[in-house]
Amino acid sequence: PDTFSTKMVRFATRSPDGSAVVFESLGKLFIKKGDERPVRLTEHDTGFEYYPVWTPDGRQLVYMHWHDDALASLKSIDLKQGKSRSLLEAKGHYIEPSISSDGEHLVYRKLSGGRLRHGAFGERPGLYLLNLKSGENSFLRRDGADAHFVGDDIYFTDRKRPTGRNSDTAKTVLFAMDVTGNSVREIANGLLATQFRVSPNKRWVAFREHYQVFVSPMQQTGKSVPLGPKVKSLPTKKLSVNGGIYLNWSNENSLSWSTGPEMTTVTLGDAPFTEESATETINLSMQVETAKPSGTLALTHARIITMNAERDVIESGTIIVTDNRIEAVGASDEVEVPLGAQIVDAKGKTIIPGIIDAHAHGRYGEGEIIVENNWNTLAHLALGVTTQHNPSSSAKLAFASAEYTNTGQILSTRIFSTGEIVYGAKSRSFAPVDSVEDALSHIRRLKAQGAISIKNYNQPRREQRQQVIEAARQENMFVVAEGGSLYHMDMNLVVDGSTGIEHNVPALKMYNDVTQLWQATNVGYTPTLVVTYGGLTSEDYYYQQYNVWEHPILSNFVPPSVLRPRSVRRVMAPESEFRDDDAAAVAKTLMDNGVTVNIGAHGQREGLASHWEMWSFVRGGMSPMQALSAATINPATYLGMDADLGSIEPGKLADLVVLTKNPLENIEYSDDVSHVMINGRFYRADTLAEQVTGDRPAPKLWWR
């Protein structure tokens, strides 16, 4: 669509008097007052703005301004005058600022260097205190996160892990300390809690567990008080319906949280555990334009592997692209190039549809910082992966990155995701499901944030997995299921109506009982050969076959510190030890029986592994055309996107890969990429500098 409504609103925080809300969307901070439309907070035209926090008087906001080169700087802005000033400019990675009640001090967390972020300027990470009057900057402690002032104390959280053989399991602990970093004491703890927030009057403590928001009375007994929805020693009230993030108190008794674009505020009365509390919900979504080019481009005289229903191959063909969609495709002597169109002579080249990776875990940010140039997604794009579906990710990062991409804030693949998995194991990611209603709560939360799919991940009982499937059906979402290397569970998941099975079925052969059953369903199969169960994987195999660290495209984008360790110090083993070709042969059997089989590179090796998936499918018996189908039209169909993606046909989005050689002759030519087109924009593969359709320069990466 030409426009869309933003969903992944982040950092939403009410002003102290409750009259306004500040939030981040598309990398910029906005303020919304009452029913008025949101307005930009600053006039920064470069970089991204994160972590807004109000001063106690509500007259100023402190925030972090991010540049990939300059890194983080902490700034404040006077809301009346609209003027910004820098509070901390020393190069570093700063997040989570919080201001003292007297407005004189700022506590923040410094991160060490990152992988997507610059690897340096992270010396002595931890919690710091900045005196806003004198500018004195003091180190408080190494451990701790989510620090926030309450009165004269700083509260923060940390994980307390077992130290002895018979010790308790790890807990999330709420600590308090004074402004010097001393007098540290434990206040509360939760086995599965992910966030604590203390109210300004120290009467309440809000916490997040199982993705839901709870509140309990604050107890300062000198001992750590256990908190949780099932703890009986203190009254606890569940406040959210479909979960929430970004917990914040705006005054003594008003707690806010976000679920997608909606911000909910609950005002606790004198008896919140026996009476209903006043609740207000506002929608912070904005209608924004999708970025796309304008004009017409003709790619002429190329071999075109269309991946249409007939799998037509045009030996000397022309593709006409207008704006961001394919207008015409056919033999060059039959397709008329419009007057005024820009022309790219692709003689000798082969063009395939953009590769769609159906199971692509990826890094979209660190510490909720989405970088301007993400070498991970850029490497995927340079190698022809134009669409990624991530079946397990951080919703706050994946869906925000998708919106940044759709509006042209960053250059990236198309990003789709499940967000967080609906996980059945006891952990801080635990998503308990004991009814369809429980499943609906998780699914509605993820859908509100931007999910198109749900990851049904190791719920232990079959009825629980069925409840997730039924809830997803009610919400018109599709369900990808973690196979978990359990054959019988895989068969249950097929019979119960999952959209697809992720990871290979742990069997060396597939017989008629399974193929006849599976072909009677619409369940797809994404075996993720790069992480094959049962033996050495395709990733191991291709490290053995090639000097991957020397790949001319991959090595241009992936830092040597990331690329070289696994690829240089590689496993060497006899051919018989590898199981990716055996798993591929099983997938071939299913494909021959009508099952939709897809590539899914698991986020391994930054785009090149998507090609390894195809190569291993051919090693397992597929033809190159079948392997290309598994990388293009099959996943497009599987993900419900085949009306727009997956083949080179009129009306579809212009996502194309220009290859220097013909992969139908040798599938291992598929990674010899010359150019990539995504959404109608044309880029050199080796640098991702835009050509012909615009002049966007090659992305600048921190490590080179």
Question: Which positions does each model-derived feature cover?
Answer:
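A flexible loop/linker signature enriched in serine peptidases of the S9 family
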Residues: 1, 5-7, 21-36, 43-49, ...
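Active-site neighborhoods of metal-dependent hydrolases
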Residues: 442-460, 497, 504-620, 693-695, ...
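Conserved blade-ending motifs and adjacent loop-strand segments that build the rim/top face
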Residues: 188-193, 229-248
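Divalent-metal coordination cores built from histidine and acidic residues
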Residues: 346-365, 372-485, 499, 512-559, ...
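Acidic, glycine-enriched loop/beta-strand segments at the rims
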Residues: 305-318, 331-333, 608, 623-628, ...
